[in-house]
Swiss-Prot record:
GO terms for molecular function: ATP binding; ligase activity, forming carbon-nitrogen bonds; zinc ion binding. Its cofactor is Zn(2+). The gene is queC. It comes from Campylobacter concisus (strain 13826). This is 7-cyano-7-deazaguanine synthase. GO terms for biological process: queuosine biosynthetic process. ATP binds at M8, S9, G10, G11, M12, D13, S14, T15, L16, C17, A18. Zn(2+) binds at C187, C195, C198, C201.
Length: 221
């Protein structure tokens, strides 16, 4: 059976990717990262619950807390305020420098070890916070680098099925494919109730609104 490493944060985008990988006939190896982000425990809980729901047998949780040591972002540095003034065209302070590059590189090492043919990652370029490492051009370039820098008998494809979708499209697709969107967590700041104001919450809520769907996770009143 063909195999895919799925980078899973516990959010709705990466969860949908895992569902799509399974539907495409891949045996999913679920990969989650702890980097001392504010909602680390809540994201890990979501990851575990989602894997159980999807019947994922092999799941790996890696400590990459060196990302927090590098710093420079509001997700790992609690002295910085997470911006809550709405989504803008500027790169927000929640951007973790080259995070996806780090994650994909580690996923590639795991894929080579596992003999996986694909890496799934839920990057979204069209309707997102404008993170530079979510661009389709970046993904294509790092995919080329991976295949140049790994064994001659290994080759894998980075699959980004959501990259050109809107958040509304992602919500609709999740509901269509019975992705467990109600188990996912998107908030950058809170672990008990989503704040509803950070970029990630705003994008999520707007996606549900445009899809005429109800988000079942708890939000602060």
């Amino acid at each position: 059976m063909k195999k895919a490493v799925c980078i899973m944060s516990g959010g709705m985008d990466s969860t949908l990717c895992a569902v799509m990988a399974k539907r495409a006939g891949y045996d999913v190896v679920a990969l989650h990262f702890d980097y001392n982000q504010r909602t680390m425990k809540r994201e890990k809980r979501a990851f575990d619950e989602i894997c159980e729901r999807l019947g994922v047998v092999k799941k790996i949780n890696l400590d990459v807390s060196f990302i927090a040591q590098i710093g420079g972002n509001a997700l790992t540095d609690t002295s910085m305020q997470i911006r809550k003034d709405g989504v803008s065209n500027d790169v927000p302070n929640t951007y973790v420098p080259f995070r996806n590059g780090v994650f994909i590189s580690i996923a590639a090492a795991l894929a080579e070890k596992e003999g996986a043919q694909a890496i799934y990652i839920g990057v979204v370029e069209e309707d997102s916070s404008g993170y530079p490492d979510c661009k389709e051009s970046f993904i294509k370039s790092i995919n080329e680098a991976i295949n140049l820098g790994t064994s001659a008998d290994f080759s894998c494809e980075i699959i980004t099925p959501l990259v050109n979708l809107s958040k509304a499209d992602i919500v609709s697709k999740s509901l269509e494919l019975n992705s467990p969107i109600e188990l996912t967590w998107s908030c950058y700041e809170s672990e008990d109730e989503a704040c509803g104001l950070c970029d990630s919450c705003r994008l999520r809520l707007n996606g549900f609104k445009k899809a005429n769907a109800v988000d079942k996770i708890p939000y602060k009143k």
